[in-house]
Design a protein with these regions (language model features):
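Sec-dependent bacterial lipoprotein signal peptides
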Residues: 1-20
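Preference for short coil/turn "hinge" residues that link or interrupt alpha-helices
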Residues: 15, 20, 72, 97-98, ...
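Structured, solvent-exposed acidic/aromatic patches
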Residues: 40-44, 90-308, 312, 316
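Membrane-proximal, proline-rich intrinsically disordered regions
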Residues: 22-85
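N-terminal low-complexity segments that are often proline-rich with Ser/Thr-Pro
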Residues: 318-321
Length: 321
């Protein structure tokens, strides 16, 4: 009788083990959360990362972000390059006048420029790279490459050497590339991305349309944008390396799709990917009451009065006061 009871107990334990093994994953999966498999199937795994990269090229936010993205844009760009270029002037006197606009650089503002133009989008780029390799979707990684270069060329031009060719690798120390090496790598990466997206565009394909807040997945427009970016980089190095500059400028201009030539080609984020984005300059000018048109820009526009009409009120980018 004792042996019979032992066998029954053993059988019961085995049955319970089998039941537990069969139902463990199901019981421990949140029915209200997306699994990795579902994310890959629905495109969310890379789609969300694409949107995140787009929002990091030039920091932009929505109402849900409150004013965080606007503040990040202000200290990273508006109080430095935007003002130094003469496009904008400032109606505030931060740090008693000792700030970036007077060339007294604030370390935290400089750090914000590096973080927003380089660090922020690195994790999203790595995720897209990994997922596109798993799912064999090189066109999505091609888009990620274009977005990465859109942001990182600003870092390169602002800070000099940056980690580029080995960025994202699992190493304790990532080497910095010289400006020449980084620019050449960007041209190579852009060429590869353009080639991939050109094929998809000729097939009439769109990519991650629901998550693309710029062109809604229009591959032809992305190719034109990438060609324009290539032309811009070529012009940037024209005095340092005329031969390379001419090569890639011609390559961009001679591409069958060409470069951006009309307003419909404009790469801008106002609504898209199910979101409504805030205009940073509008907020800095009309909500913060701090950003104004720069005197240099105003002086240039005085030479053609109609320019003042088109650049001030209708777009609500800024007001002339």
């Amino acid at each position: 009788m004792k042996k019979i009871n032992q066998y029954k107990l053993l059988a019961g334990i085995c049955a319970l083990s089998l039941f537990t093994a069969c139902d463990f994953e199901e019981l421990n999966t949140n029915p209200f959360e997306m699994t990795d498999e579902m994310g890959i199937r629905d495109g969310v795994a890379v789609g969300g990362a694409v949107t995140a990269m787009q929002r990091a090229v030039v920091t932009v936010g929505t109402q849900a972000d409150d004013t965080d993205a606007i503040n990040q844009y202000q200290v990273a760009y508006n109080l430095s390059a935007d003002s130094w270029s003469g496009f904008f002037g400032q109606n505030n006197n931060w740090y008693s006048g000792s700030n970036n606009t007077t060339y007294y650089l604030q370390d935290n503002w400089v750090a914000a420029t590096y973080t927003n133009s380089y660090t922020t989008l690195l994790s999203s780029w790595k995720k897209i790279k990994q997922e596109s390799e798993k799912t064999e979707t090189p066109e999505i990684f091609a888009l990620a490459q274009i977005l990465k270069i859109s942001a990182w060329h600003k870092t390169l031009e602002s800070f000099g050497p940056i980690p580029y060719t080995h960025a994202g690798e699992p190493a304790l120390v990532i080497p910095f590339d010289s400006e020449q090496v980084a620019f050449n790598a960007m041209f190579t990466d852009l060429t590869a991305a353009i080639d991939i997206l050109t094929v998809r565009a000729e097939q009439g394909a769109t990519i991650v349309a629901d998550y693309d807040a710029v062109y809604a997945g229009d591959t032809r427009k992305w190719v034109k944008y990438a060609n324009s970016l290539m032309l811009r980089l070529a012009m940037r190095i024209s005095y340092a390396d005329e031969t390379t500059a001419q090569k890639y400028a011609r390559q961009a201009l001679n591409h069958p799709f060409g470069v951006m030539t009309s307003k419909s080609d404009e790469a801008q984020m106002s609504t898209g990917a199910g979101m409504v984005f805030r205009n940073n300059i509008d907020w800095l000018a009309n909500q913060y009451n701090e950003c104004r048109m720069g005197s240099s820009m105003f002086s240039y526009l005085l030479g053609y009065q109609l320019s003042l009409i088109h650049i001030s009120e209708p777009t609500r980018h800024l007001r002339i006061s």
